[in-house]
Amino acid sequence: MTNELINGVALADTPEKLVKAVQELALAKDVAAIPTLIAVFGYNNPTAAAIASTALVQLGEVAVPQLLTQIDDYNYGARAYSIRTLAAIADPRALDVLIDAAATDFAPSVRRAAAKGLGNLHWHKLEFPDNQTAPKKALETLLFISQDAEWSIRYAAIVGLQGLVNIPDLQQPIHTRLKEMLASDAEKAVRARILLAQSQ
């Protein structure tokens, strides 16, 4: 059954047929569909990609290894969907990929998705001492990109920092950085997002 649905995605020859085929494949909730759902990210069909991403998030942790290995280095749109999906699943195995994407990817959409994801990972799933060191690595990256020239990256860094602020060891450096940014950032939207983070 799933093979037929996978073939349906491969054979879809219009954007509308692709969306319908991906919807049907998503409903199967079958791990065998994971590679095809990830491949849909590269088909230049935002509706189909969004459906595929939602399906992968619903499958959860079982999708993470293939999401990590199938990241598209050449198509930044596909890469952004992969990063957003990993961020939504929030499995800490994605930490290094999210750090790399947030700090170095050339596509702002990829960097923003990764930055937000870094504040949202399920750290409790890590064993000691990784559950101590991993959030600090995320913090270092977010502090670094909070100085980026692009305001939307700084904004995403604040979202990520807000996600980490519940970790006691990280509260002081986060509060300090947000105060610095509130006093110095020229972008009104960034300052507004800082105030929101501080009010939570």
From Swiss-Prot:
SUPFAM superfamilies: ARM repeat. Pfam families: HEAT_2. Required for the chromophorylation of the CpcA gene product. The keyword Lyase applies. Its EC number is 4.-.-.-. This is Phycocyanobilin lyase subunit beta. One of its GO terms (cellular component) is phycobilisome. GO terms for molecular function: lyase activity. Keywords: Antenna complex, Lyase, Phycobilisome. CpcE and CpcF associate to form a lyase. The keyword Transferase does not apply.
